[in-house]
Amino acid sequence: MKNSERFSAAKPLMEQGGKSSRKPGFMSEDRISELPEVLLLQILSSLPTKLVISTSVLSKRWLSLWKMVQRLEFESSRNIYDFAENVTRSLLSHKAPVLESLHLKVGDQFDGVYVGVWATIAFTRHVREFVLDLSSYHGPRVRFPTSLFCFDTLETLKLDYVYIYVPCPVSMKSLRTLHLLSVVYKGDESGHNLFASCPNLEHLVLRRGFFFDAVVNFIIDAPSLKTLLLSDPFSARESSRGYVIKAPSLKYLGIESVEGFEYFLIENVTELVEANIRNVSKIVNENILGSLKSAKRLSLDLSPLKITYPTEVMYHQLVYLEMHTHKVEWWNLLTHMLDSSPKLQVLKLIDRETRHENLEFDKKYKDQGKWNQPKYVPECLETFMWRNCNWGREEEKEVATYILRNARQLKKATFSTDPIEAKRLCKLAKRRKMREELDGVVMTSNSCHLVFEFE
């Protein structure tokens, strides 16, 4: 709902109750001031903090009303010194017994002491969500005070581009959500002690950045953790050896851009429901695919030449599989997954759009092996989708034909393609030929509906 709609929607409330002391025929233009304070605070909480504070000049009633707003958000302006002083003054003037959330985004170099001041004030107001975003800041990383990891009312903490040092366990018993983005850690113990201090942590987002820190072994030990998103796009650090994940309550796992470590080990995630694994390669010792055997839904963007897939692992719970088809020999990973997933119901393959030719180098320049057909297609397979299918290699045609021919319970097969430019009509002719070939495949499923569509 737009802000103007909030104000207009509130007007009838003022016309419903009580007698007015104003003379007949007098119409107040300041109807909103007559609303109950609780409703006014709800309205103010939906507005930018800068605008909320400016309402103090409206009238005597509004003078202190903004000080009770429970959600504050500040973003730095060009004059960083005025900004820092204004934020400090605003927080010191704030009177709400509980501060629901405080968001701070600073893009210019400033005195890092302010971070401690702001956070301390917020935590004494029993803040429940604290966000410090320095992602646009180009100065040296600001240290987040260790003493501030000791507030039990905090439920959500999001830090971006800071330096942390946690030499011993602290206390954040209420923390449920933790985001650590481009954070520098002083030694292995900082991360380990931080996670150990959050016994009720449920959601963790961890994105490492391009920097040097002293972490050698990154251990995530969180018994209550339910969702984990881990990204390490600059993982080729000389100091780092790898990751260990200990999260027995984990329901969702996302791993992206992890490469070149000595190890990546996941322990005992027997409650896992869904996982999304992308761009993982060149790890000496890892058990990523082997640890996902309890998952019901998987999305994989991997090359079987660069990751371990143990042949003895069975995915007995897997019903939905999504695979990207632009990595080297992706079809052999598909064979492994089909042979290992007896209850699979939905198979979705996703290729890169043909106009992104610079992303198609794997198909053109790698000496790829031939496709080894699976032993069978899962009996439960009902839906087969192939998005942006290009059929640039014979093996891809074999995959499509094999599934259509051998999926006994298949109900719908959909092949979608992206549009082709007029100057590439030869490719259009090849696509039409492939469509005719697939349309002529004799399928074992009598009820399968074959669909061809453009994106």
Curated annotation (Swiss-Prot):
Annotated F-box domain residues: 29-75
LRR repeat placement: 80-106, 155-182, 183-208, 227-257, 277-302, 325-351
FBD domain ranges (all copies): 370-417
Record's keyword terms, sorted: Leucine-rich repeat, Repeat
Ranges for region Disordered: 1-26
Keyword presence, ATP-binding: no
Annotated protein name in UniProt: F-box/FBD/LRR-repeat protein At3g51530
Originating species: Arabidopsis thaliana (Mouse-ear cress)
